[in-house]
Amino acid sequence: MVSIVDDDRDITFLFEEALKSIPRITIFTFTDPILALEHFQINEYAYVLVISDYKMPGLNGMEFLKKIKDSNRFVRTILMTAFQIEDKVFNENTKKKIINAFLQKPVGIHDLVKEVETQLDAYEMQKKFPS
């Protein structure tokens, strides 16, 4: 399972359509990070990847992905934003393995699909050779 979380419904729709080209995944989209977190907690071990926007009402993407990783450290995560994130904050969260990849908005469809495939492959390797 792959989740796309962004408060912009157009983005979730566009990304879902783009990722349908990857046959091995089931995609869920959410515009509310709280609902996405609830869905994740019910299905946490079925998830392979969570893609989240940074700036969302109620729970920002960094906090959201930290909660995801606290529940299942093996799930892969991608953070995306149109805003500049402080390098120190980004590096700290990357080092803690909360964020596995970052995409700067506007995200090109090719870049999105390529990064998702990279993260799916990394998940498979991680399952074979857990650290």
Map each language-model feature to its residues.
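Alpha4 helix (beta4-alpha4-beta5 surface) of REC/receiver domains from two-component response regulators
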Residues: 63, 84-101, 114
